[in-house]
Amino acid sequence: MLLLKAKRSFEGYVLISPEGNGIEGIAFVPATNGAAAGSFYLVNQSDELGGPDPSIVFEVEINHAASGPEARIVRYFSVGVTDLSGIHYDASSGRLLIISDSNEALLVVSLTGDVLESYPLPGKKQEGITIDGNGSLYIAQDAKEALLKLIQK
């Protein structure tokens, strides 16, 4: 097992507070230019849109240096809602699917951070999101119904 550590700040701005809620979701996006393996997109669960420890999405690249691999934050963006709790990369559309627990919303977001679509979600306490091989969307919940199947393409 390899443990990668990333700094909690980017260009002097604190993105992840040690006392905060922390990272809730991670998705891998393969590189299209062949220069790197790809990037990880992570969501930080927070009740704040600004200030230290904001509710944001950030992109992390892995640098395979001679001294060992290092995780490096390369950029971040806000999607305008708090309490981000899950993220999935939809390779068929090239978009990120992001859920917000307290807002009970599904956001469709470009890799540059533009919110393209927003949908209300049924249920409560959505925590995880994925798409199966048939294009059906599943959301895990910390509620009575543990798994929701929402959309079939």
Predicted regions and their residues:
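Sequence/structural signature of beta-propeller domains
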Residues: M1-K153
